[in-house]
Amino acid sequence: MSSRKVLPTKINLINLRRQIRLIRTIKRLLENKREVLLLYLRQYADEYEKVYNEVSKVLSDVYSTYLQGVASEGLSTIQTYADSIPSSLNVNTSIKVLFGVKIPVVDLDESTIQQQPFGNLEISPYILKSREQMSYAFKKILTLIEIESSIRALSGELRKTQRLINAIDTSILPFYQSSSKYIKSVLDDRTREEFTRLKMVRKLLQRRR
């Protein structure tokens, strides 16, 4: 939209200047929001790296212990044990709001973890240990999923915030500033013309006297 399409009146000039101040205030708020989002993202990124390393180590231990159990019991026996245990794990999901951004929360319902899934069966201690390790690893994996989803949500909000700032800098604010400048220029010209006309009228009146 051209700034010349705005009617050059004093009221419009006052309104434009007021809107320019408001736009600059909004931009400052968006810039503050961007800084806070970046801070949260850095924190989540650090936490993600920490938990990821923990998960990698735990899973490595799980596989190592599990393979020892397989070597001890035999793969077919382990498969029979696994098939005899019904699925019971339940994961609860919810949403929390962080600085206006919806963040997913994922929790394992620990009451759904079977305490003695193998009953009174004689089973390799390696399998029992790997199961305990996997239970811990699963909780960490859920934490990792939650952090990753949070990073994705915060990154999306950051991109949206940056687009708004860019729109203000490249389109909105320049339009209002050029419109204000155009109206001021027209009003100044009118003032000068009015002043010149008054001078001429005064001279004419003086001559008639």
From Swiss-Prot:
Record GO terms (molecular function): ATP binding; proton-transporting ATP synthase activity, rotational mechanism; proton-transporting ATPase activity, rotational mechanism
Any Gene Ontology biological process: proton motive force-driven plasma membrane ATP synthesis
Membrane protein topology class: Peripheral membrane protein
UniProt keywords, alphabetically: ATP synthesis, Cell membrane, Hydrogen ion transport, Ion transport, Membrane, Transport
HAMAP family tied to this protein: ATP_synth_D_arch
Role: Component of the A-type ATP synthase that produces ATP from ADP in the presence of a proton gradient across the membrane.
Name of the protein this chain belongs to: A-type ATP synthase subunit D
Organism the protein comes from: Sulfolobus acidocaldarius (strain ATCC 33909 / DSM 639 / JCM 8929 / NBRC 15157 / NCIMB 11770)
Taxonomy of the source species: Archaea, Thermoproteota, Thermoprotei, Sulfolobales, Sulfolobaceae
Gene this protein is translated from: atpD
